[in-house]
Design a protein with these regions (language model features):
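Transmembrane alpha-helix interface/packing and boundary motifs in multi-pass membrane proteins
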Residues: 10-26, 56-68, 142-147, 232-242, ...
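Alpha-helical transmembrane segments of multi-pass membrane proteins
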Residues: 14, 91-104, 226, 230, ...
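Membrane-interface alpha-helices at helix entry/exit sites of multi-pass transporters
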Residues: 42-47, 81-103, 258-268, 404-405
Length: 432
């Protein structure tokens, strides 16, 4: 129990920091788990991950409303609307977004838990069939083409991912193995550093921020329950779509709300909270990652030789409770903690954001240096080889950043390339 409490508290702390600081992406939670996955059982990995992503959305709105610094990417959709709100309206927003986030978080947790009771291999054995998996993965690959509408770059990323993904299946032709030798020694952690983390150093952060000290007291405005329910459902659905779940949910809820700027903001923040939880459903039900968070968790499961659709129903440390049971209970408890913390100490959060904002580059450089140092220490390759490969992936990542192209197709095919090639080869032999 002590370990469980420590994991939840650690997740809450990282979730708050991730939400308050725009330099830290939402996938930083599972990224941190690379350093501890060997000593943590599955329930602890899932709890930490889901607690962090939930907190990043809770506190992303706190950062945005108090200082106009988008604490997380999905907040960008309503940033300009804050200019048209009065002080009292912004005070009420802090309360209403917290309530909306709490309701959305609980509803999506219940949805995830109930859905997994029915959508699993025991009840639906066809989920493991080659036909179903081919259809599922093909739809996912096709949907990746529409993330940023950059079809050519997405296709190139998919091809690169296939070319360098680990090939352990000897049904694959020797050509794949020959291409792989060009990238001998890389790790998925290195790819994440290069294409996602290090490019954040090149992002320009707006230095003009506002910190209205009169926002330190929130106002308990009236909650529009219909709007909250609608946005929660939109977020649940958006969370099942491959791509940046939180941003997709925010944009969808924002654009379908026509009752004023304040309601649009509440809708966006409510939707993104439910989406970051339900995006776990494809991973836990089908072992199918659909965004950066779930891709990292999928890789962690591979490192621990876990098949998630069956592993979540095994007994946890709590005896009769399964891994899924203890995860759902812990996540629900953390949501109430987030609600309390996000409606108190507002002035402290705002001052923390302002004090760190001017040092954001230094903070990121320090974080990246530590991450590279630890990975280099554990890498099974030479320093020159490591730095060369990291430079290659970083160049790709910076290019994608400035071209506004998502690295998700590359990560998806690196993780699942071996399985995808095997599936398509089997399908070809069976049906042609």
């Amino acid at each position: 129990v002590t370990t469980l409490i420590l994991i939840i508290l650690a997740g809450i702390f990282v979730g708050i920091i991730t939400g308050l600081l725009p330099a830290l992406p939402v996938y930083i939670g599972p990224f941190i788990l690379y350093y501890f996955h060997n000593s943590l059982s599955l329930e602890y990995l899932l709890i930490f991950w889901l607690v962090v992503v939930s907190g990043s959305q809770f506190f992303g709105s706190v950062a945005t409303i108090t200082t106009r610094i988008p604490g997380e990417e999905s907040a960008l959709v309503y940033l300009k609307d804050l200019d048209y709100l009065t002080l009292d309206e912004r005070r009420a927003l802090l309360y209403q977004t917290a309530v909306g986030s709490l309701i959305a978080g609980i509803a999506s947790t219940v949805f995830l838990y109930v859905a997994l009771q029915y959508v699993n291999l025991d009840n639906l054995p066809f989920l493991s069939s080659i036909k179903f998996q081919i259809v599922l993965y093909t739809i996912t690959l096709a949907s990746l083409l529409y993330i940023n509408k950059n079809y050519l770059w997405t296709l190139l990323l998919i091809c690169l991912g296939f070319a360098i993904s680990p090939q352990n299946n000897y049904a694959i032709t020797s050509t794949w193995f020959e291409i792989k030798t060009l990238f001998q020694g890389y790790t998925f952690f290195m790819v994440l550093l290069g294409v996602m983390i290090i490019p954040q150093l090149f992002v320009k952060y707006d230095s003009s921020i506002t910190n209205d000290t009169q926002l330190n007291q929130i106002a308990r405005g009236t909650q529009n329950l219909w709007l909250t329910a609608k946005s929660t459902i939109l977020g649940i659905v958006a969370g099942l779509v491959p791509g940046p779940s939180a941003t997709t949910a925010s944009v969808l809820a924002y654009k379908t709300t026509t009752t004023g700027a304040k309601d649009r903001i509440v809708a966006a923040e409510t939707a993104n909270n439910s989406s970051v939880i339900t995006c776990a459903l494809p991973l836990l039900a089908f072992a199918l990652p659909i965004n950066q968070n779930t891709l990292i968790m999928s890789n962690l499961a591979d490192l621990k030789s876990l098949f998630l659709p069956s592993a979540i129903f095994e007994n946890s440390f709590a005896g009769t409770l399964t891994v899924l049971d203890i995860t759902a209970i812990s996540l629900t408890a953390s949501l109430f903690v987030y609600y309390f913390l996000s409606t108190h100490l507002i002035d402290f959060y705002a001052k923390l954001i302002v004090s760190l904002h001017s040092k954001m580059k230094l903070v990121m450089i320090g974080v990246v240096a530590v991450l590279i140092g630890i990975d280099l220490y554990t890498a099974e390759t030479t320093v020159v080889s490591y730095l060369t490969l990291l430079a290659v992936f970083t160049t790709i990542g910076v290019f994608l950043k400035f071209k506004n192209v998502s690295p998700l197709p590359l990560l998806f095919t690196i993780i699942l390339g071996d399985k995808l090639v095997w599936l398509y080869l089997q399908a070809y032999k069976l049906y042609f």
